[in-house]
Amino acid sequence: MSNALEELKKYTTVVADTADFDVLSKYGSQDSTTNPSLVFQAASDPKYKSLIDDAIKYVNAKSGLSEKEKLSLAIDKLFVNFGVEILKIVPGRVSTEVDARLSYDIDANVKKGRELIALYKEAGIDKERVLIKLASTWEGIEAAKILEKEGIHCNLTLLFSLIQAAACAEAQVTLISPFVGRITDFYKSKQGVAGFEASKDPGVISVQQIYSYFKKHGYKTSVMGASFRNKEQTIELAGCDLLTISPNLLEELKNADASLVTKKLDSTKLPSDIPNKLDVSHSNFLWELNDNEMAYFKTGEGIRKFAEDLVKLENQIKKLL
């Protein structure tokens, strides 16, 4: 019998937002997204101890590295180990995140992206199956532009505004991950409300606007809605190129009726009020981002949170080196 999850898959590529292998097998996800927070959670589970042990062994076999370089390589190798295992389960791609503390450094982002791809190659994984995740700062987008020209595909995350999305599209990145739930959180707090009806949810509307803008202007960059707070938000975005959904919401969709899902986003039926191409020059990008209180705040907050979880993971690994 069909359910809401199966129905959603008819219109949208469903991606599991998890580093838990059991979950990936259960829901038949096409791709998987990971981030420092998810890997930190998974790495605390004894069943993934072998992946940590392998990363430590890999680093200890290298000579001439400083303590800082050892730690950095161990984290990268651990992320790649998770990615390699995930790719044994999903038929598509895995997203692996660059250190959030590099979000304002073009060269460091490019270097880290290349290093992660080299580790995947060493493990026998083709770069076509990997997306390098970068924050949607000006520097992150510029780094993605360089990596994409080298054939390294990128997923621009922590994206909260049309200006960030437009800059990514002009940079010809493979995929963007506009966040829904964190936008919802911001406006719930600001307006002092308990929640929004899905069709009027500011986070949902943001993704709808980005999707329509990309399709109107013929951009090839895929839109993958991310960061959902309830199943209704995902249902309202049926038809989006991809949606990355957490395990608890995948379960809710699996248990919900298929009749709840109809195609909401359609590239052949776009609204009439889509803006012309935005000015994505450096100065205008910074101004537009600064002028959007929510996007400015949430981008910075998201970078800090990912950095915080990465430090926790580093502290865990440091004891083993």
From Swiss-Prot:
Catalytic activity, EC: 2.2.1.2
Cystines in this chain: none
Enzyme class: transferase
GO biological process: carbohydrate metabolic process; pentose-phosphate shunt, non-oxidative branch
Cellular component annotations (GO), alphabetically ordered: cytoplasm; nucleus
Cited SUPFAM superfamilies: Aldolase
The entry's keywords: Cytoplasm, Pentose shunt, Schiff base, Transferase
Gene3D superfamilies, alphabetized: Aldolase class I
Entry GO MF terms: transaldolase activity
InterPro entries from the UniProt entry: Aldolase_TIM (IPR013785), TAL/FSA (IPR001585), Transaldolase_1 (IPR004730), Transaldolase_AS (IPR018225)
Chemical reaction(s) catalysed: D-sedoheptulose 7-phosphate + D-glyceraldehyde 3-phosphate = D-erythrose 4-phosphate + beta-D-fructose 6-phosphate
Catalytic residues (positions): K133
Highest taxon above the source species: Eukaryota
Annotated localization: Cytoplasm
Pathway this chain belongs to: Carbohydrate degradation; pentose phosphate pathway; D-glyceraldehyde 3-phosphate and beta-D-fructose 6-phosphate from D-ribose 5-phosphate and D-xylulose 5-phosphate (non-oxidative stage): step 2/3
CDD domains on file: Transaldolase_TalAB (cd00957)
Subunit-level organization: Homodimer.
Function of the protein: Transaldolase is important for the balance of metabolites in the pentose-phosphate pathway.
Family recorded in the similarity comment: Belongs to the transaldolase family. Type 1 subfamily.
Record PANTHER family: TRANSALDOLASE (PTHR10683:SF18)
Protein name per UniProt: Probable transaldolase
High-level lineage: Eukaryota, Amoebozoa, Evosea, Eumycetozoa, Dictyostelia
Name of the encoding gene: tal
